[in-house]
Regions:
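Short, solvent-exposed loop/turn and secondary-structure capping segments
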Residues: 10-15, 38, 60, 123-124, ...
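Short, solvent-exposed turn/loop segments enriched in Gly/Ser/Thr/Pro and often Arg
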Residues: 3-9, 15, 191-210
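Histidine-centered active-site microenvironments of extracellular/periplasmic hydrolases
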Residues: 1-46, 50, 69, 96
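Polar, surface-exposed loop/tail segments
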Residues: 42-106, 173, 181-186, 190, ...
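Beta-strand elements within well-structured catalytic alpha/beta cores of enzymes
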Residues: 1-3, 24-27, 54-59, 162-168
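Active-site regions of oxyanion-processing enzymes, predominantly non-cytosolic
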Residues: 5-10, 18-20, 108-112, 163, ...
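C-terminal, low-complexity/hydrophilic appendages and adjacent surface loops
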Residues: 18, 94-177, 206
Length: 210
């Protein structure tokens, strides 16, 4: 059982931060198949899991031949893949709201690169604009009654953000410019660059060329 997007509130859904990427995910193991669980029964895990892992896992359990183009890993069963120490994530267009974000996380720190930093987190997406909460937010923004943190949702983003989601679950303290996090930021930048080149990310092309 899983959701298809992050928190369904403004700033969550459709945004390239942990708040937008993270979804609930539950696996139920009947008595007959509980031996397939590497985590035990009735427990939770902080293992890094991606939607990319679902197809390889199901194909493996069904005894099928694994297509070479699949990128995920097998989560459970005899062919379970080793755990990963980081996940690479992406967020792009949502309906009429263009965007392009690439992210890497180790489970605690989340580094996101906003290629369209001129687009605010609360960018105009028609589907969301008809909701009452978004209308109230825009009205308060226009009336200048929001505090700086609240206003930031309607202002251009920083090109890079680095959040410690263990100590900052709402992702409001960007650590990217702090000297004590410079080494970590550099490692995450390099990892993301290498991943983008390895995967040959086609969404860097204009949409009309895809």
């Amino acid at each position: 059982i899983f959701a298809d997007h992050g928190e369904g509130m403004p700033r969550g859904k459709t945004n390239g931060i942990n708040f937008g990427y993270r979804v609930p995910f539950t696996i139920w193991f009947p008595e007959k198949y509980k031996h397939l669980s590497p985590w035990g029964i009735g427990t939770s895990t902080d293992e890094l899991v991606s939607f990319e892992d679902l197809a390889p896992t199901l194909i493996s359990l069904a005894g099928g031949e694994m297509p070479q183009y699949l990128k995920g890993r097998v989560l459970i069963g005899e062919q379970r893949s080793p755990e990963v120490d980081k996940l690479f994530l992406s967020s792009d267009r949502a309906d009429n709201g263009i965007d392009m974000v690439r992210t890497v996380t180790d489970g605690r720190f989340v580094y996101s690169r906003n290629y369209m930093s001129f687009m605010p987190e609360a960018r105009f997406i028609r589907y969301m604009e008809i909701g009452e909460i978004k209308q109230v937010m825009r009205r308060d923004f226009e009336k200048n009654v929001l505090d700086p943190l609240q206003r930031s949702l309607f202002e251009p983003r920083q090109a890079e953000v680095l959040y410690d989601i263990e100590n900052d679950i709402w992702e409001t303290k960007n650590l990217i410019s702090l000297p004590e996090f410079s080494e970590l930021a550099a490692k995450m930048r390099d990892a993301l660059d290498a991943h983008i080149l390895k995967r040959r990310d086609v969404l860097f092309l204009p949409e009309y060329e895809l």
